[in-house]
């Protein structure tokens, strides 16, 4: 009997990953990141989530989003909402935790392992829910920074924690290459379209 293939899905909190890598002095090479986890099993899906503002110009982030979309990532974006709090201060709301959680729960019956690129403690409930469904959860964040960027309750709940510093040699962008754009900026040209995802073609692009 042939060994069972480990089916993996990546769930990337775009801004969280960008901030974590930058705090350690490097930028992510998303091609290398994809290749690294393809080597660990059958990579069924790689989700990338980022909130966007309606008034930001698309040109500043277009290269990154376009590249992700055409190279095996499922890009999910949501427009941020501005509001005024009780003190009269203008604030921006753009949390994508729910979108990530829903996608993970829906995909749970089809995967063996979830790799979560985030240190947000709010994901503890999601991690528990995935584990109850028989999915092994790996959290990738930073514990070596001061202060640590991963919530300790999330780190403890995960089946495995990987400090992103240990992955730097495998997923960091060559400093001589053109730097990646900051994922907080978003393209207004992004359309709600879907195409089949595979290792050489594009992924799924969604705007919420």
Language-model regions: role of each:
Residues 1-208:
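Terminal and domain-boundary accessory regions
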